[in-house]
Each structure stands twice: as C-alpha cells, then as structure tokens.
Design a protein with these regions (language model features):
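Transmembrane alpha-helical segments
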Residues: 115-123, 145
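Structural signal for alpha-helical transmembrane segments and their membrane-water exit/capping regions
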Residues: 95-96, 154
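A general structural signal for well-ordered alpha-helical segments in protein cores
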Residues: 30, 56, 119-120, 149, ...
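Membrane-interface segments at transmembrane-helix junctions in multi-pass inner-membrane proteins
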Residues: 42, 108-110, 125, 131, ...
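Preference for short coil/turn "hinge" residues that link or interrupt alpha-helices
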Residues: 13-14, 119-120, 161, 167
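Transmembrane signal-anchor hairpin modules in multi-pass inner-membrane enzymes, especially those
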Residues: 1-95, 101-104, 108, 128-141
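Residue-level micro-sites within transmembrane alpha helices that shape
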Residues: 37, 51, 95, 111-114, ...
Length: 177
C-alpha cells in the first residue's frame, strides 16, 4: 500500500470515527473527500480494500445523524421545495423504468437521483449555520481545485475523460460540475 493510500485510509477512518462519536458533520466532510479523491480509480489507491467507499460513508453518517434532534424552528427537509421536486422526479423515474428505451442508462439515472435525495437530506440536516455553509462550500472548492490540478497535470489532449471522480469521470459531466 502506498503512503498516500495509507494516509487516505487513516483520514477516512478518522472522519467516520469523528462522525460517530463527535458530530455527523465529519461524515459529510468525509463523503465529500471520498467523492473528489476517488481513491479506487487513482494510481495510489490500488492497495486499498475493494469497498463501496461512498456508500459506507453515507451509511455511517446516516447512523450518526440518528442522534440529532429535529430543529422545531426549521421546515422538515422533505417539505422544502427542492426536496419535493427531487422526490417527485425520482419517483417518476422509478415508475417509468419498465418502459424505458435504454433500461440500463435509465436505471443508472434513477439510482443517481435517489442518491441525490440522500445527500440532500444529509446536507439539509447538517448544514444549519453560516459557518457550516462556508466550510461546506470550502470543501467543494478544495475538491474542485484537486480535480483541476489532476486535469492540469494529466497527459490528456482534448477531452478530459477519466479525470473526474465517480459520476463525473467523462468530460461532459466534469465540465458541468
């Protein structure tokens, strides 16, 4: 295992431990790190165990969030306009799955939107102050900087396929991100 992989693994375990025993926000930060670093597809991640890193992070964060008491002054997450839209659209995707023209791509899309709902729930429940919003946005900026650094140092001419992480590994979705 490379030194980079060992550091990633140590930070991953630390982030999940902090999420469970201190504050679930660390699980969300770990999720962002796993998304942007995309360890299984990097040269330094070859020695890491074959895990569903994002799923494990989301599961641990969800378990850690169970101890949070709902804020009586906030609208429940599922009653916000974006959540209603996401839920309705995702349900519609699953309903129309049997007659989709490209069942495999349609299934991937439905799964992706289901994941968006879970991440939306986590972000809505955990990011509740301006300081946490700034920290969350900073984590995204740092992740985007890392992807930009990978793109800049890659030996790819033309389209940047394979530079991004999970779900953004082709040049079109990476560009949208």
């Amino acid at each position: 295992m490379s030194l980079t992989a060992a550091v990633f693994l140590a930070c991953f375990v630390t982030g999940l431990g902090l999420a469970l025993f201190r504050n679930p926000i660390y699980g969300l930060y770990t999720y962002i790190a796993v998304f942007y670093l995309d360890a299984p597809n990097r040269w330094w991640g070859e020695g890491l165990p074959d895990l569903r890193w994002s799923l494990l992070t989301a599961g641990v964060t969800a378990i850690a969030m169970l101890r949070l008491k709902p804020d009586p002054d906030r609208v429940p997450w599922h009653k916000t306009a974006p959540a209603v839209f996401f839920i309705a659209y995702t349900l519609w995707l699953w309903i129309q799955s049997p007659w989709a023209l490209d069942p495999e791509m349609h299934r991937e899309c439905a799964i992706q939107f289901t994941k968006f709902i879970i991440v939306y729930w986590m972000v809505y429940r955990l990011i509740d102050t301006p300081v946490l919003s700034a920290d969350f946005l900073l984590a995204h900026v740092l992740g985007s900087f890392y992807l930009g650094l990978l793109a800049f140092t890659s030996n790819v001419s033309g389209r940047l396929d394979g530079v991004g992480g999970p779900g953004i590994d082709d040049s079109n979705t990476l560009g949208m991100h």
